[in-house]
Amino acid sequence: FGIPRQYREMPQQKREATSYGSGFILKDNYIMTNFHVVEDATEVIISLSDRREFIAEVVGVDPLSDLAVLEVSDDDLPTVNVGNSDELRVGDWVIAIGSPFSFDFSVTAGIVSAKGRSINNNNIGNYVPFLQTDVAINPGNSGGPLFNLDGEVVGINSQIYSRSGGYQGLAFAIPINVAMDVADQIINDGEVSRGYLGVRMSEVDSDLADALGMEKPYGALINDCLLYTSDAADDVIS
């Protein structure tokens, strides 16, 4: 898996940068983007479509979901309409807006290929049920919005699957419902809280279902209870 990010700005840019990405503005001057876009940044500069620029403050980040919330001080900012990613269906058309390779405010389109994808990339896939699309995503698109045809943000473009390092038709976006839950916790609580079962589980595949005498594979198998957690023997009744 590759994370689409831009390591250097194009030569004609005035300001030298070590990372280049996209984002979108929510109400109350908050901005959402990917964590890997602002990771280790000493200064974050926001450039709008009307060419205004602002220095943004990082309100908080959540590396496990690859999300970051920024804030700028201005009362005249264009905001997006937030949609409901749960209402997306496979085959729906979606549109991405971002700055691939520093080509600002580029638009690409495609369809939702799958929902609830789990990918193994720096453990992010363990916490995010990704939307898979065939929208063209390249370095610089990270953190940018994925819109439905009603103009509502339904995802945050985050990752690609590639053997060459470039777009190959497999792009992954964080569902906006997941992103907004993370953002609300960062803004209101300063951190993200997650539930913890204290057990190791594995997915029940066809082979395991046969071994357990199941008619078809479904559910999960609890393999072990972790030490020093609230779970203990006899806690689970089967």
Give the role of each language-model region.
Residues 1-227:
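Serine-dependent protease modules
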